Amino acid sequence: MFKYLILLFGTLCFSQELVFNNLFDSTLNSKIACYRIPSIINSTNGTLIAAIDERNNSCGDLKWNRDINIVLRKSYDDGKTWTKIEKIIDYPLGESASDPSMIVDRQTGDVFLFYNYMNLDIAKDVYRFM
């Protein structure tokens, strides 16, 4: 009987419907080739923050793309709704940022965003971590 109670409990826990949202859809903007390398965190106040590469002109990686920005969206209601896309890292053409990674300091509530940077006009093949 104990086995069946565990099975029933597990069934009840996972009976909620899964909902999938496409937060970053490149087909909605002809200037964007693709979105890649997502990062998502849950802040100490419950805000979900999703960041991602916005790759313009091509889907090429940092070394091959002169225009990669980092954008984000936030949700204040557990992912039911999301803010509009906000561009947070946007260097001049020839300088790009990619591969966002976020961490939360649970003591202070601060959110840190790290990313790769490359200036393709001055130092191609030199990655800097910001």
Predicted features along the sequence, with ranges:
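Asp-box/BNR beta-propeller blade signature and adjacent active/binding-site loops
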Residues: 16-130
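Sec-dependent N-terminal signal peptides
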Residues: 2-13
